[in-house]
Amino acid sequence: MAIHKHFVLTLKLTLILASFISAINSLADSTKSVILIIGDGMDDHQITIARNYLAGSRGTLLLDKMPFRGVAQVLTIDEVSGLPVYVADSANTATALATGQVTSRGRIATSAGKDLDLPTIVELANGKGYRTGLVTTSSITDATPASFAAHVSSRYCESPAAMVNIVKYGIELGSCIDDLKANGGLGSISEQLAKSNLHLLLGGGRQYFIANNSVGQSTAIQLAAENGFTIINSWKEIDNIHPNDKVLGLFAEEHLPVKLKGEADRAAETPKKSILNRINNYFGEVTLPSPMNCIANSDFMDTPTLKEMSKMAIKQLSYENRDGFFLMIESASIDKQSHERKPCGSIGELDQLIDAVSVALEYAKENPDTLVLVTSDHTHAAQIVPDKSLFSEYPMPVYTPGKIARVFTKEGGILAINYATSNFEAEEHTGANVPIFGNQIAVSEKLPTYMLQPDVFSFMARYLELN
């Protein structure tokens, strides 16, 4: 009888212990993480252009197969009046994604008018014990990554040497007087990133980390070393990185080279009018630019791909980590190439984004409490137009205004892409809503199919229980 009671007691204790271990394992297995992937300037036109080129008109991209798809309305306000502004830049839109607040163009995680610092999801996640990382194909001091971990009144205050009377491309771009350390501010973007609690930063922008504005002042790269970052300047150096190291990877002086370019580095061109057509629009001829091929960019060969950087980031952030992580990955030059009217460049960078999405979804498949969101900050200039006008039978030359690029596709067709938002050397952003894609968690957690852009922050913060 005593033996039976002892057996029952032992069995009960064993079951309780097993239940406790199971609960612990379940808790460990349910570690929440968020991977936010941003295609800068990626809208439905850019996605369709890339799909037509990469997969064919009947093909699909990985984005098309994600369980959730919705749209976000972009919000911007005027710096002085606070009235709505209907076309954004990357600074205020990244601020919306990073902080859930609406601000004016050019601001990095600071409020319009009052210039208050706005807490970012990176800072909130750090405060809750999550590891955090930023990966980009631009300079890591550029507007999108900066908005997740820095606070300045102007996106152009990227280094200690660029805080007062900033001039870029021959244009005066203002100052960040109140952000100067001498005035009690946090310093430039590069200094703030160097002193941040981020676990990982990968991208370009080396020049902003070695610049200073006075003899004896520490550079941002010195501050980063003092803050425990292992600094690498070449992808070959990753073999020296321990999985638990804090990493600052600076793989270019400014932005990383793009994957594809037009042959002979061609961009969109202006249709050529005959002399007679210049005299009278109803007569003569207008000749469209000759079609181009997209080719591999030789400058890209030694550059880490966005896929490689994304894999490394996830490895570093997840290593021996039961607390989860927040990772922002940006394909930056969809936008930059569109500004330059270079569709092949934008196509290649959207292809890079898709590769990064593949890496994120693969990780989420093995770690099912990982939320993966893919979105854009704003829309852009490129649009698909008829290669042969619908009105070509009219007895006059009919052609697209602005500049046009005609790209040979793998199907043997010609994809005509128009840029006509500006008479300046660079194209403008546009003001439509942006797409947002998600994995199954976006569905199960009931992310709305229509939302305001700041709501993306709220959804991520709620999922990570940061509020």
Model-derived features: positions:
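Boundary at the C-terminal end of the N-terminal hydrophobic targeting segment
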Residues: 26-30
